Amino acid sequence: MQELYNPSEIEALVQKHWHEHKTFEVTEDESKEKFYCLSMFPYPSGRLHMGHVRNYTIGDVVARYQRLQGKNVLQPIGWDSFGLPAENAAINNKASPAPWTYENIDYMKNQLKLLGFGYDWSREIATCTPEYYRWEQWFFTQLYAKGLVYKKTSSVNWCPNDETVLANEQVQDGCCWRCDTEVIQKEIPQWFIKITDYAEELLNDIDTLDGWPEQVKAMQRNWIGRSEGIEMTFAVADSDASFDIYTTRPDTLMGVTYVAIAAGHPLAEQSAQNNPELAAFLEECKNADTTEAAMASMEKKGVATGLQAIHPISGKLVPIWVANFVLMNYGTGAVMSVPAHDQRDYEFATKYQLAIEAVIKPVDGEVDVSKEAYTEKGVVFNSGDAFPELDGLDFQAAFEAIDARLTAEGKGKRQVNYRLRDWGVSRQRYWGAPIPMVTLADGTVVPTPEDQLPVILPEDVVMDGIQSPIKADKAWAETTVNGQPATRETDTFDTFMESSWYYARYCSPHADEMLDPAKANYWLPVDQYIGGIEHACMHLLYFRFFHKLLRDAGLVNSDEPAKQLLTQGMVLADAYYYTNEKGARVWVSPLEVTVVEKDDKGRIIKAIDNQGHELVYTGMSKMSKSKNNGIDPQVMVEKYGADTVRLFMMFASPPELTLEWQESGVEGAHRFIKRFWKLASDHVAAGKTEALDTSKLNADQKALRRELHKTIAKVSDDIARRQMFNTAVASVMELMNHLLKASQETAQDRALLAEALSAVTRLLYPIVPHMTFTLWNELGNEGDIEDSRWPEVDESALVEDSKLIVVQVNGKVRAKITVAADASKEDVEALGMSDEHVQKHTEGLTVRKVIYVPGKLLSIVAN
């Protein structure tokens, strides 16, 4: 065995062995318990970043641990390879996104292999290939046949100059990223999948996700947003028209003083025909940002329509206003406004001098709405002659009373609503899977016939940055269906479509069908899923929804796609910049910082880069291109080895918290690996050891063996149950300190070290697999470490024959005594009192009290 640890040589040899022996390729095996471990697959952006490395190291640790538990472990990998970044790169290079994407896949695949991740590469998928998206297209046509797909108009960002749709990322300060034209909102037809049909099940089944973080479950509950309320009808005065309103606070109904409708509401458009001020306001609203963040912060504005609504109970007339805070695609596009009991309504009413009438007050006091709305649930008052029975009722009683009356009069009904909207899957982009729908000559829209699937996206195109190549390619759009001329849909799927079912395709990636049900039902659900919490309300919700669609299509037999979810934290790094002669910030990579001075608390107070610029240090922030503080994993692997990078990633922080990148920590991880290697090397060099005879161990040897088996127990629990990989590593490091100090004089000393090295090699294997793979055979074990078993705890080793008792006299430690583990209180007292140090400090004193804390402390009080 070589004495010095050489990571580049070791890792190359081990990776070659894994490749040649197809170590991580698996098939279904009913005789074994399966374990499916999956990390969210990457977008092939060009290079791995440390966030990827953290995610995939966590997954690899879990997978390798489960393999040593004797399970049949599937850990696949692939590429989420459609999307806007490839289009942008192609536009910059006046090329096609396809070659850029495939080159990036090749490069990043090599990076993943250098890090030693134990993937089954035979199952590799790329979502941009027809072999993959063919089945997505097929499934979409099945959903259409079941009535779960429909088309309607929806708002998009539109550049009037380029006459093209823009993604949110392509809108910069309200203008087109390419030509700086002001962006407007435009209604265009788009395809939707009815996720709302599954809203109740998606919400209820959150309660079954015992292995998911509570934060993710809470975010999904809020996103689905179930509410119970009443939908009621308001008639329009002097008209046959009426409109519906939904409210979760029917107890405030008698306080309605105006109604607000969306700019896209039919009544708004009708009223604007003879109202230039309103028409201009509707145009302004069309171009407004309607994201939640923008809606929350924007100025609330409105224009009166001139119409009045009839209150469904009192018959009172209330004005109808168009307001920019009401959206047509949320609820009914109209809200009843009760300014006394809703702060937004209050501010609007104050601004436009509308009436404010309080109808709810605290149970035990009066209400004051002179400065702000009273928004709590209290008791009803001031209901007027139309419904005096409401006065004095609490929220629930008032809800029931109003529901009963409106239902009886045919003016309303109780209803459950969801905040969740149907999933818009159309994208007016090129680099995505074509939506498999066609329009016939008579205008009928039908699915592409199955024998014409896949609808292949042409890859030999040039991006001009203005129009999608398939929208410009009339020849591509022209087709025939059943002998009739037809035109293809030129929108492509939202890329969340591909990432919603990839986990299932891994089970049978080469099948000539969407899924092989037998294989899918062997592997699914995923046992451990790993990815960022930023995906809680989009990918992770669509992921769950798609699984239920697959179940209802008879392709899988489980209700949820993943049993356990781990959401890893971000990776942070130091960020530095200097200001150039133009006054712009120039961000400098931490790797280019050559001088760093710190104060006595370790805070950076001065930094200089390799060009001599004095830098401003802005603290730790998420690794990003914009701050140039990303650390290239490949540079670190070349410098320290993959095992060191993996060890640092696991040791530096609990997995769900942020990880602060510190090269000093990487160096520390490297030193630990080298120490362990040397300990093993010295042991091997000393020759063979005799068998361990636990009956012959002395007290020190028993204590060391106890530490070993306590460590095995703790590391097992940390990895399997707690998923606290950092404390698992810390426990092994602590054990290492004991091993380095242990005597090596006798044959039993060396036999005990052999047991410890064998166990620690396996404990470290999931985290540092290359070094431990090599050591396993060097230590005299047969076969590959992947085929070994996780070390078992010897419960007898944990039993202590003796205890070390601290003896205090008047609160000060005066002695430490060793007693039999089963010694009685009387025996311990007698032994403690006979100790020469205790006698010295009690001489001439009267012992007043003796307190014994079993197995730990003997406290003597004397004066």
Curated annotation (Swiss-Prot):
Family: Belongs to the class-I aminoacyl-tRNA synthetase family.
EC top class named in words: ligase
GO molecular function, one term: ATP binding
UniProt motif 'HIGH' region: location: 42-52
Pfam families, alphabetized: Anticodon_1, tRNA-synt_1, tRNA-synt_1_2, tRNA-synt_1g
Catalytic activity annotation: tRNA(Leu) + L-leucine + ATP = L-leucyl-tRNA(Leu) + AMP + diphosphate
GO BP terms: leucyl-tRNA aminoacylation
Protein residues bound to ATP: 625
Gene encoding the protein: leuS
Residue intervals passing through the bilayer: none
Motif 'KMSKS' region positions after renumbering to this chain: 622-626
Keywords from the named record: Aminoacyl-tRNA synthetase, ATP-binding, Cytoplasm, Ligase, Nucleotide-binding, Protein biosynthesis
Main location as per UniProt: cytoplasm
EC number: 6.1.1.4
GO CC field: cytosol
Cellular localization per UniProt: Cytoplasm
Name of this protein: Leucine--tRNA ligase
UniProt entry tagged with the keyword Nucleotide-binding: yes
